[in-house]
Curated annotation (Swiss-Prot):
A motif (Selectivity filter) lies at residues 369-374. It comes from Oncorhynchus mykiss (Rainbow trout). Residues 357-368, 369-376 dip into the membrane without crossing it. One of its GO terms (cellular component) is axon terminus. This is Potassium voltage-gated channel subfamily A member 2. Glycans are attached at N203. Residues 307-320 are annotated as: S4-S5 linker. Voltage-gated potassium channel that mediates transmembrane potassium transport in excitable membranes, primarily in the brain and central nervous system. Prevents aberrant action potential firing and regulates neuronal output. Forms tetrameric potassium-selective channels through which potassium ions pass in accordance with their electrochemical gradient. The channel alternates between opened and closed conformations in response to the voltage difference across the membrane. Homotetramer and heterotetramer with other family members.
Length: 494
């Protein structure tokens, strides 16, 4: 038991525990209360609660002093009442921020900016609201490389960058159109395949190939590849990270779009048909056609400049689980109904279903409701199986579609409303604070002249007030607050 000595009215002496460890200032601050008036609704909290976040508007004594009403001995804010419950809970809970259900996102975002809760609180709020955190886009350290990187990677950064993006899109479209037109019969040159002529004078076979390098489509393709290669090499030179550059799917597509040209070029230059090698040349031509087919992937280069294609790619990526389930269900249905229709048509002499693998095509076409009609059941049992197959296909495809559509809507709205949300959650500016201060003043019962006098006195004396006095300003009520009268008198006398 601790025995108190001296004056029994001394609170410090009567405090239980070790008297040397007792801090009366801490106990004094713990008891101080702050009254905050939000558009007529009064809130009361302890000073130490607000002091947990000294960089915010309510936590900084100098910042909140601008809104002090000395006649009412309270802080007045002409702000949203319903939002302040969550703002005050932010201080009481140590940093947890939850938007009330009856407050819209834009209004609550404005309140966060006004009370200057900080970037960390905004990020936590965005995560709680379900916003996907935007990926950081590093820029090169070198100034020249940074300008080049912005020029080729971010079309919205400047006018020249927009022009380069337009040129790139036009070249991609020209390349795709050329790829399609060269297959038309009037443009197709069937002399690409090697042919031979027997020379009776030398008793040898001479192989000929077409003049590939004089083909107008080859010249047009060469011009497109020059631009693609130039663009790729410049972006590779200016990129901030080489490993990150080659890890990007879009850059891999760029490489895939360029490589077939050089493989084709090398094959044409190295091709020298000799006697007995006609079969190898035919095989080489087949491989070459497959390589040329890869050129069609250039169409994906448009996704670099198209938000719609990017949204589609994000939707497919987010819906991989649903797409996998769809393919799995289709696989089960194909096996089940192809087996059923085969045995249902087994006794039919003119049946088109000669085996279960032959019926796979019919099952896929029926379940996807395409119905080419090249394979049809003729027996009653086969028609029943076909009907069940079509119904099962409709149900199987329809089930995961709403989930995929929901993902698409999410990414679409996130992309279209991203800029507006970023503006709502942007940092508060000095002009915004001044405007909010004017609104707060206009809603007070004190006259304009009185406010000007009080504000002038606050501005002239706030820097001279010691920090410990700011902690015990007029609005705070304690068991023994000796600074209350002095500060009130100072503000009202000005």
């Amino acid at each position: 038991m601790t025995v108190a000595t001296g004056d029994p009215s001394d609170e410090a002496a009567a405090h239980p525990g070790n008297p040397a460890e007792y801090d009366p200032d801490a106990d004094h601050e713990c008891c101080e209360r702050v009254v905050i008036n939000i558009s007529g609704l009064r809130f009361e909290t302890q000073l130490k609660t607000l002091s947990q976040f000294p960089d915010t508007l309510l936590g900084d004594p100098k910042k909140r002093m601008r809104y002090f009403d000395p006649l009412r001995n309270e802080y007045f804010f002409d702000r949203s009442r319903t939002s302040f419950d969550a703002i005050l809970y932010f201080y009481q809970s140590g940093g947890r921020l939850r938007r009330p259900a009856n407050v819209t996102l834009d209004i609550f975002s404005e309140e966060i900016r006004f009370y200057e809760l900080g970037d960390e609180a905004i990020e936590l709020f965005r995560e709680d609201e379900g916003f996907v955190k935007e990926e950081e886009r590093p820029l090169p350290d070198n100034e020249f490389q940074r300008q080049v990187w912005l020029l080729f990677e971010y079309p919205e950064s400047s006018g020249p960058a927009r022009i380069i993006a337009i040129i790139s899109v036009m070249v991609i479209l020209i390349s795709i159109v050329s790829f399609c037109l060269e297959t038309l019969p009037i443009f197709r040159n069937d002399d690409d395949e090697p042919h031979s002529v027997f020379d009776t004078n030398t008793n040898t076979t001479i192989y000929f190939t077409s003049t590939y390098f004089t083909d107008p489509f080859f010249i047009l393709e060469t011009l497109c590849i020059i631009w693609f290669s130039f663009e790729f090499l410049v972006r590779l030179f200016a990129c901030p990270s080489k490993s990150g550059f080659f890890g990007n799917v879009m850059n891999i597509i760029d490489v895939v779009a360029i490589i077939p040209y050089f493989i084709t070029l090398a094959t044409e230059l190295a091709e020298k048909p000799e006697d007995g090698q006609a079969g190898q040349q035919a095989m080489s031509l087949a491989i070459l056609r497959v390589i040329r087919l890869v050129r069609v992937f250039r169409i994906f280069k448009l996704s670099r400049h198209s938000k719609g294609l990017q949204i589609l790619g994000q939707t497919l990526k987010a819906s991989m689980r649903e797409l996998g389930l769809l393919i799995f269900f289709l696989f089960i249905g194909v096996i089940l109904f192809s087996s059923a229709v085969y045995f249902a048509e087994a006794d039919e002499p003119e049946s088109q279903f000669e085996s279960i693998p032959d019926a796979f095509w019919w099952a896929v076409v029926s379940m996807t409701t395409v119905g080419y009609g090249d394979m049809v059941p003729t027996t009653i049992g086969g028609k029943i199986v076909g009907s069940l197959c079509a119904i099962a296909g409709v149900l199987t495809i329809a089930l995961p579609v709403p989930v995929i559509v929901s993902n698409f809507n999410y990414f679409y709205h996130r992309e279209t409303e991203g800029e507006e949300q970023a503006q709502c959650l942007g940092p508060v500016t000095k002009e915004d604070s001044n405007e909010e201060l004017k609104k707060s003043r206009s809603g007070s019962t004190i006259s304009k002249s009185d406010y000007m006098e009080i504000q002038e006195g606050v501005n002239n004396t706030i820097e001279d007030i010691p920090e410990e006095n700011l902690k015990t300003q007029a609005n705070c009520t304690t068991l023994a607050n000796t600074n209350y009268v002095n500060i009130t008198k100072m503000l009202t006398d000005v």
